[in-house]
Amino acid sequence: MKRICSLFFSSIFFVSLVTFTSSVTAQELERDLIFTPNALPSESHTTSLNLQIRGGSPPMVLPFLDDFAWPSFFEESGVDRPELVRWDSSPVRRTSTFALNPPTIGVVTLDGLDADGYPYVFNSIDAHGWADTLTSREIYLGGLTTNDEVTLSFWYEGGGIGNAPDLGEDSLIVEFKSIGSEGDLWTRVWEDSLDVMSTDAFTQVVIPISDGIYLHNNFQFRFRNYGTLMGNADLWHIDYVFVAENGITGNPIEELAFQYPPFTLLRSFSAMPWTHYSDNPEFYINDTLVVGHTNFGMGPNNQENTGISIQLQDLDPIAFENEFIQNVSVSEGPFSTEYMADLLDAQGVPASILFNPASSDTTAVFEVSLWENEVGYYTNQSAVYDNDSIGFSQVFTDYYAYDDGTAEKAYALEATGGQLAVRYPLAIPDTLDGLLIHFTPFYDNAELETFVIKVWADDAGVPGEQVDTMYQFHSPQYFTEGYDLFAYYAYDNPVPVSGIIHVGFIQ
């Protein structure tokens, strides 16, 4: 019997990008993402450079704090900003879109991928074991006693948007390091094997560091996960790791923080061609941007003042200052704010034409920055790595995109001849040159399998007749240079298109 090989992918570009959430039939497969290429700086997958930290830096002093909003791995900051580094190198990555309801923007995610972004055990259907390890830098605890009430606290969640750990099979543990006569000794001090784990909310854990064997000058702690070794599944997310004296309650320092990174100010798309946007800018701009925050504590900083700025790349800023929430009290815990309502720039231009069509004739990229100034000042930087200021690029070039470009799961058609399409309403007539698709390896290497890319006209909301005939066979291309990279697949010939179209492939 002929074996049918499924092509697992997670996103497609029409010269565009979309993550599929279609319903699954008997001839379709949906799988948690088993492979993710190597990390980009924003979602860093650390590699083994490490001893430059353990061998070249003195132990850290308390308090130890990391909410994973800044680049705290050596591979991100070790050379230029060693004071930001909190961790020894490990096969762990910072993510900002995998978790649900995180305390602050950015978490660290433990999974079944190694330091190169490949499964620890590839081409296997059932491989479990110890996977990722995240180890702190050495911390100076010498001279402290039980009376100092040193504690480790953190927040954690299983699964989130990705695949959750399996009941009775997977676990997350914490270990402390003591010094024995024969070297370092690691002792398990906490474990969650799904007895109390939540897949859509974070739980706080507080662990006393009270035993005298841990109160030494080279103390370290580490997180380890036991689960699948086959890729990006059985996910554990950790946030707001805090070690301090007098910290028995585990309360962090008082502050306001963002929860998620926004990725678009457009109504439906995350990116679109500049000439298409310019045809009707007020239609495509969103009328609001709701952003989630967390308020830790109810002290003097529970007055929130927010701002937003837009800057055309390589040009002077276009000043937008959103202060309509100025001096408003916010409740403790999660809350949200709207950044677009009643927003005007210095010349009174409304937010409905936030990205001025006069900025360019062909393409434009805008840097969008949002901030909270509960600390008493604004920042004009773009994409600041901090939990009270965030940024993203709003891209207008030559493609349409729907989502944020992060692939949490893989999707496939199981049957030969299976067809898949994504719907795009075009602003103006244009010519379609090709698709960008992110494929992910799943069990079998599908590089020798083939598919044909297609484009269909719309028929009452579903694909209708093929717009053009395509014959060119393509094969999946995989990358190891970074996360969520896309391969370009050109149509046999440029295709004139207008109105609503559907793009995809037949395998």
Sequence positions of predicted segments:
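Beta-sheet-rich sandwich/jelly-roll-like modules and their strand-loop junctions
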Residues: 373-461, 500, 507
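Surface-exposed, low-complexity/disordered Ser/Thr/Gly/Pro/Asn-rich loops and linkers
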Residues: 86-149, 160-162, 237, 406-411
